[in-house]
Regions:
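Mixed-charge, low-complexity intrinsically disordered regions
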Residues: 1-117, 139-148, 164-172
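Short beta-strand-centered aromatic/proline hotspots
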Residues: 116-133, 137
Length: 172
C-alpha cells in the first residue's frame, strides 16, 4: 500500500525543463511535462488533498496491473496531467481506428496504435474524447515519436483493449 508524506510537493525544474514531484531532498519523480505544456510552473506547491486522493486512487487502480516499482511514477504522471497540463489538442488522425469496442473507464489501461503500439492510462473523458498518458514510447502514423508520460487526446474509437499477463505466478 502506498503511503503519502505531507512534505511531498510539486516543483518546476528549470534545469531539466520538467515538472517534478519532490518526495524528499534526494528523491523526486520527474514527469514528461515541459514548461510549454504547463498551465502554471509550481514552486514548492504541496500536494493538495484532491491530488493526494487522486494519486492514491490511480495507484490503487493500477495495483496488480503494473509492477509495484512503477505505481507511484505512473500515478504521479496522471495527477500532474490532470492538475498542471494544458488540455491537449485532439490527435485521433495520428492513430489507427479500432473496430474492437474498448472499455473507457477512467484509471484503466488500453492501447493506441500508430506505426507502433503503446499502452496508455485513461485519465479524463469527455465523450467521445479521452485523455491518455502514454505508458511507453510509440511512433505515430506520421512518423513522429512520442515518449512515455506524454498526454494525448483521442476519440474513444482509437482505443484497443489490452491483455495482461499475470504479474504473479499461480502457486499450488
Amino acid at each position: 500500500m502506498l503511503s503519502l508524506c505531507p512534505d511531498w510537493c510539486w516543483q518546476y525544474c528549470d534545469e531539466q525543463d520538467r515538472l517534478v514531484l519532490q518526495l524528499s531532498n534526494s528523491h523526486h519523480i520527474q514527469t514528461a511535462f515541459s514548461a510549454k505544456e504547463l498551465t502554471t510552473k509550481p514552486e514548492q506547491q504541496s500536494l493538495c488533498m484532491e491530488q493526494a486522493q487522486l494519486l492514491m486512487d490511480f495507484a490503487e487502480a493500477l495495483e496488480g496491473v503494473l509492477p509495484d516499482s512503477d505505481l507511484l511514477t505512473v500515478a504521479a504522471q496522471a495527477v500532474a496531467a490532470l492538475s498542471f497540463v494544458k488540455a491537449p489538442v485532439q490527435k485521433s488522425h495520428l492513430f489507427n481506428f479500432s473496430s474492437i469496442e474498448t472499455r473507457t473507464d477512467l484509471m484503466s489501461i488500453a492501447k493506441l496504435e500508430g506505426l507502433s503500439r503503446a499502452k496508455v492510462l485513461l485519465v479524463a473523458k469527455a465523450d467521445p474524447m479521452v485523455d491518455c498518458v502514454l505508458l511507453e514510447p510509440m511512433e505515430l502514423l506520421n512518423g513522429k515519436q512520442l515518449s512515455a508520460g506524454q498526454l494525448v487526446r483521442v476519440q474513444q474509437n482509437r482505443l484497443m483493449p489490452v491483455q495482461f499477463a499475470p504479474l504473479y505466478a499461480l502457486t499450488a
